[in-house]
Swiss-Prot record:
Function: Catalyzes the reduction of hydroxylamine to form NH(3) and H(2)O.
GO biological process: response to hydrogen peroxide
EC number(s) recorded for this UniProt protein: 1.7.99.1
UniProt lineage: Bacteria, Pseudomonadati, Bacteroidota, Bacteroidia, Bacteroidales
Protein name: Hydroxylamine reductase
C-alpha cells in the first residue's frame, strides 16, 4: 500500500505500527507531512544555534528559543490540524534559519553541510520537500527508534517550557539542551549507546522543566489545595475552557467577571479548580464533562463557546452544532475554528467569545455532585507524618501511580476495572486525564486519606516524583524502588513520553505502560528498556493486581 505519510508518535497509531494514509487522530496526510518539514527546519535551526553557543557567540537567542518550543508544541498529537497554520510556521522557520545562517557566517562560524541547515523552500514547494524529510528518512530501525523517542520527549518538554514561558519563567539551560539534542539526533554522529544516554538525559531535563512549570504555576497562582469541584451546572450561560494553559484561564476569568457568564473547565483544565488564586472568582463554576475524547458529545450539550488553549482537539462530526462555537489559541488550530491571537505583551482579547456566550443557552446537565482533587506535593507533604504513619501501621499497603493520558480505545476500560479491583488498603496517585477513568468511583478513604489522590495536570506528575523522593528520605531508604509505590501508567501522546523518561532518569524501575507499548519502540530498543528498567506492558486486571500488589 502506498504511504502518503508516516506517523507513529501516539498510542492510537494505526495497527500500533504507524499511520500511512491519514492520522487516526484525524489529521490529513498533507498536514502530517508538513509537520515533518517543520520539525526538520527546527533541527536545522538547532544545529546553527548549538554551533553558535559552542563558539561563544553572544547574541539574543530568545527568538529562536521560542520558535523551537512553540513549533515543537504545535506538532504534538491533537494540537493542530490546520495546514495553513503549520505552513506559516514553516515559512517563519525557513526565514529564521536564513537569518541565523547569515549571523553565523558573519561571526566566522563554519556550519555543518547538513541538509537541515541548508534547505530553503517556497510555499509551493513545501509538499514536495516534506516528502523527503519524514521519519523514515532514517533507515536503521533501532537508530530511528532512539531518535524519535528523544524527539517525542522533546515535544513534551517543549509543551511544558512554553507554559512556563507564558508565566515569565524561562530556563536557558533547558533551551540550550533542547537545541543540542535536536542537533545530536540530526547530525548522525552518535552511537546507539550514546543515543540511549541522550534519551535518559532528555528525561533528566524533563524533570527540570516540570520543576520549572511547577514553580511558575505555584508562585503565580498559589499551591493547589484539597478542593471539592462542582461537576453540575448553573442557570447562566457558560464558556468551557479546555487544555492546560493557566495564563489563558486567568485572562478568561478576569474578562468574564461581572458579565453574567460562568466559566467551566474541561479535560486537563480541571486542576485549575485547585489553585487558590482562581477561587476568588465567583463565576468560576466548576468542571463540565470528562476526558478529551468525549468532547463530541459533551460540547453539544454544553451549549456555549469552547476555548482550546492546548491539545487535545477531536475533529468534530460534519453535522456538529458546536463547530461555530470553538476557538483556539497558542499552538492549537483546526480548519474553520476561530483563532485568538495574543498581543506583543501576551495579552488576549476574549470579547468575541464572551459576546457569543451571552447569546447561548446555559449548559445541559450531564452529571451532578462533586469530585475531589488538589493533592499536589505541597498539600500531600503537609500531611507527610500521617501518610508515613499509615504506611508504617500497614493501613496503606501500596501506592499505585496511575498517571497519564486517557484515550478512545475500548481496552482502556482496563484502568477503570484495575482501580475497582485494587485492595482497599491501596491508594491511587494520579495526574493527567487518565484520572477520568476512576476519579468518580466511590473508592472511599483510608484514615481520612482519599484512595484517589489527584495531583493535577500531566505535568504535575512532577508532584508525584517529589512525594516519592520525600517519602524515600523520611523512611530512610537508599533506593526509590524500595518504596511501597508501583507504577501502572496509561500513555497517549508526547507529554506522557517526557513524563516516562523523567521517571526513568530518576531511577524508577518496573513501570507498566499501556494500553500498548509505543509503536516507535523497535524490538531491540524495547528489549533494552525491559532489561535495564523493567518496563512492561499490561496484562489482564487479575494478572497485574497479582504482579503489582504483592
Amino acid at each position: 500500500m502506498e504511504k502518503k505519510m508516516f506517523c507513529y508518535q501516539c498510542q492510537e497509531t494505526a495497527g500500533n505500527k504507524g499511520c500511512i494514509l491519514k492520522g487516526v487522530c484525524g489529521k490529513d496526510f498533507s498536514t502530517a507531512n508538513l509537520m515533518d518539514l517543520l520539525v526538520f527546519n527546527l533541527k536545522g535551526i538547532a544545529i546553527i544555534m548549538t554551533s553558535m553557543r559552542r563558539a561563544g557567540v553572544k547574541a539574543d537567542y530568545r527568538k529562536a528559543d521560542k520558535a523551537i518550543m512553540e513549533s515543537l508544541f504545535a506538532t504534538i498529537t491533537n494540537a493542530n490540524f490546520d495546514y495553513s497554520s503549520i505552513a506559516k510556521r514553516v515559512e517563519k522557520t525557513f526565514a529564521l534559519k536564513a537569518e541565523l545562517y547569515s549571523l553565523a557566517f558573519t561571526q566566522g562560524i563554519e556550519l555543518p553541510e547538513n541538509e537541515a541547515v541548508t534547505m530553503q523552500g517556497k510555499p509551493e514547494e513545501y509538499d514536495r520537500l516534506a516528502l523527503s524529510v519524514g521519519i523514515l528518512r532514517e533507515t536503521d530501525e533501532d537508530v530511528r527508534s532512539l531518535k524519535e523517542l528523544t524527539i517525542y520527549g522533546l515535544k513534551g518538554l517543549a509543551a511544558y517550557a512554553e507554559h512556563a514561558d507564558r508565566l515569565g519563567y524561562v530556563d536557558e539551560e533547558i533551551n540550550a539542551f533542547t537545541e543540542r539534542a535536536l542537533h545530536d539526533v540530526t547530525m548522525g554522529l552518535l552511537s546507539a549507546e550514546e543515543l540511549t544516554a541522550l534519551v535518559l538525559e532528555t528525561g533528566s531535563f524533563g524533570v527540570k522543566v516540570m520543576a520549572l512549570l511547577d514553580k511558575a504555576n505555584t508562585e503565580t497562582y498559589g499551591n493547589p489545595e484539597i478542593t471539592e469541584v462542582n461537576i453540575g451546572v448553573g442557570s447562566r450561560p457558560g464558556i468551557l475552557i479546555s487544555g492546560h494553559d493557566l495564563k489563558d484561564m486567568e485572562m478568561l476569568l478576569e474578562q468574564t467577571e461581572g458579565t453574567g457568564i460562568d466559566v467551566y473547565t474541561h479535560g486537563e483544565m480541571l486542576p485549575a479548580n485547585y489553585y487558590p488564586k482562581f477561587k476568588k472568582y465567583n463565576h468560576f463554576f466548576g468542571n463540565y464533562g470528562n476526558a478529551w475524547w468525549k468532547q463530541r458529545e459533551e460540547f453539544e450539550t454544553f451549549n456555549g463557546p469552547i476555548l482550546f488553549t492546548t491539545n487535545c482537539i477531536v475533529p468534530p462530526k460534519a453535522n456538529a452544532s458546536y463547530k461555530d462555537r470553538v476557538f483556539t489559541t497558542n499552538a492549537t488550530g483546526y480548519p474553520g475554528f476561530k483563532y485568538i491571537e495574543s498581543d506583543q505583551h501576551g495579552r488576549k482579547d476574549f470579547s468575541e467569545i464572551i459576546a457569543l456566550a451571552k447569546t447561548c443557552q446555559p449548559p445541559t446537565e450531564i452529571e451532578s455532585g462533586t469530585i475531589i482533587g488538589g493533592f499536589a506535593h505541597h498539600q500531600v507533604l503537609s500531611i507527610a507524618d500521617k501518610v508515613v504513619e499509615a504506611v508504617s501501621s500497614g493501613a496503606i499497603r501500596k501506592f499505585v501511580v496511575m498517571s497519564g493520558c486517557d484515550g478512545r480505545q475500548s481496552g482502556r476500560n482496563y484502568y477503570t476495572e484495575f482501580a475497582e479491583a485494587l485492595p482497599s488498603d491501596t491508594v491511587i496517585l494520579t495526574s493527567g486525564c487518565a484520572k477520568f477513568r476512576y476519579n468518580k468511583l466511590q473508592l472511599g478513604d483510608i484514615g481520612g486519606i482519599p484512595r484517589v489522590l489527584d495531583a493535577g495536570q500531566c505535568n504535575d506528575s512532577y508532584s508525584l516524583a517529589v512525594i516519592a523522593l520525600k517519602l524515600k528520605e523520611v523512611m530512610g531508604l537508599d533506593d526509590i524502588n524500595k518504596l511501597p509505590i508501583v507504577y501502572n501508567i496509561a500513555w497517549y501522546e508526547q507529554k506522557a513520553v517526557i513524563v516516562l523518561l523523567a521517571l526513568l532518569s530518576l531511577g524508577v524501575k518496573n513501570i507498566h505502560v499501556g494500553p500498548t507499548l509505543p509503536a516507535f519502540l523497535s524490538p531491540n530498543v524495547a528489549k533494552v528498556l525491559i532489561e535495564n528498567f523493567g518496563i512492561a506492558g499490561i496484562g489482564t486486571v487479575e494478572e497485574d493486581i497479582r504482579t503489582l500488589i504483592a
